[in-house]
Structure formats: C-alpha cells, structure tokens
C-alpha cells in the first residue's frame, strides 16, 4: 500500500489531463481536465496544488513527450517547464518525468474501439492520456 496517492499529468497547451492512483498503487483512474492557456502563462498550478492536497498526493508523474529518436522537442520542453512551475509552487512534491510517447494515440485508439463519439472523445482524451501515463508508471513499480 502506498503512503500517498500518485497523480499522472498529460500537459498540453490548452489542457492538463489528470489521473490518480488508488491507494494500493495498482490502478489509475481519470480524475479531471484543467483548462489552461500556455500562451498567457495561465497554467492552473494553484488548482493543481489544491488537487494534490485534497487527494493526499505524494508523487506527480508528468508525461514527457519525446521524439521517436529519443530527443526532446517543443512539447517536451513545455512539460519540463510545467514541472519547474509546480516545484516552485509546491517544493515538497516528488515529480517523476515519464516517457509518454504514443500515450495520446493509445488513448484515442481505446476510445475509438469503445465507439465513443468524436464530441465525447474531445472531452476525455487528455484525461485518458493521463491514465495511460500513470498506469505505465504504476506497472513499472510492480
């Protein structure tokens, strides 16, 4: 059993998908999607800190998008910046960067296979991608 829950984040330019672990650290469930505006530096960090405190989270796993050649591109740099902003606001949180290559595509494929409408997919895709990121991390622990 974990001492604290683990949060998974899929950071985009307009949204942050959020997933949370169960207390045993076995499964990831979609929790929320934060609306952000990266261009205006409105990153939802205060809202995220509230979620961390409310759910007794000790570790945050942030998806790190890498190129297929393992280099870090623009979106990867944005995720690293998000990590730094979160650490500034909440220095005691442990943050793990997790290779998220293909997580959004896997989430999209799952939703398509479940015959979820395009409208509904747009609403849940970021949260689902966060679930894939967090579940990958949780699986690596066991």
From Swiss-Prot:
This is Putative pre-16S rRNA nuclease. Keywords: Cytoplasm, Hydrolase, Nuclease, Ribosome biogenesis. Belongs to the YqgF nuclease family. Disruption phenotype: Not essential, it can be disrupted. Pfam families: RuvX. It is an enzyme of class 3 (hydrolase). It comes from the Bacteria. The keyword Hydrolase applies. GO terms for biological process: rRNA 5'-end processing. PANTHER family: POLYNUCLEOTIDYL TRANSFERASE, RIBONUCLEASE H-LIKE SUPERFAMILY PROTEIN (PTHR33317:SF4). InterPro entries: RNaseH-like_sf, YqgF, YqgF/RNaseH-like_dom, YqgF/RNaseH-like_dom_sf. It comes from Staphylococcus aureus (strain NCTC 8325 / PS 47). One of its GO terms (cellular component) is cytoplasm.
């Amino acid at each position: 059993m974990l001492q604290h829950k683990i949060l998974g984040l899929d950071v985009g330019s307009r949204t942050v998908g959020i997933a949370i672990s169960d207390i045993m650290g076995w499964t990831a469930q979609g929790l929320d999607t934060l609306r952000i505006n990266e261009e205006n530096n409105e990153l939802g960090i205060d809202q995220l800190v509230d979620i961390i405190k409310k759910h007794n989270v000790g570790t945050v796993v942030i998806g790190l998008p890498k190129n297929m050649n393992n280099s870090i591109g623009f979106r990867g740099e944005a995720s690293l910046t998000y990590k730094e902003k979160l650490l500034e606001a909440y220095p005691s949180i442990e943050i793990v960067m997790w290779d998220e290559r293909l997580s959004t595509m896997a989430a999209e494929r799952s939703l398509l296979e479940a015959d979820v409408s395009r409208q509904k997919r747009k609403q849940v895709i970021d949260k689902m991608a966060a679930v894939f990121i967090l579940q990958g991390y949780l699986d690596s622990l066991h």
